[in-house]
């Protein structure tokens, strides 16, 4: 099986609890013989939009069509998910809307999950 993890951490990897847990999950998948790709959204140059845009994020969105599972990893910020994951959800909106109109369901038969980390600041 092929998995893709979208890492929505806002911090550099060395300081990020989210990145540490993402790497643990990636290693666990690989130990089970599964392919796993990690995309750290913070490292990409992409537009925040609810439309189809050709930028550094676009090829990774296409990868969703060719994998078996997608995981969105985010820290908790002020009781909610991080801004990078929010942008990712917004970028998926045109695909969902297009599929409703065309009876093509690229998200069907895929496993979607979330990985949420918190407490890095000792408060949440």
Go through the PLM ranges and name each one:
Residues 103-124:
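Short, glycine-/small-residue-rich phosphate/pyrophosphate-handling segment
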């Amino acid at each position: 099986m092929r998995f893709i993890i979208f890492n929505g951490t806002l911090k550099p990897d060395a300081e990020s609890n989210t990145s540490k847990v993402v790497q643990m999950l990636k290693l666990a998948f690989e130990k089970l013989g599964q392919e796993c790709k990690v995309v750290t959204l913070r490292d990409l140059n992409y537009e925040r939009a609810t439309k189809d845009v050709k930028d550094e994020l676009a090829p990774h969105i296409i990868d969703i069509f060719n994998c078996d599972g997608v995981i969105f990893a985010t820290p908790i910020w002020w009781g909610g998910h991080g801004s990078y994951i929010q942008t990712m959800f917004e970028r998926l909106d045109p695909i969902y809307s297009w599929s409703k109109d065309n009876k093509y369901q690229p998200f069907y038969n895929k496993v979607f999950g979330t990985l949420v980390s918190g407490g890095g600041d000792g408060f949440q």
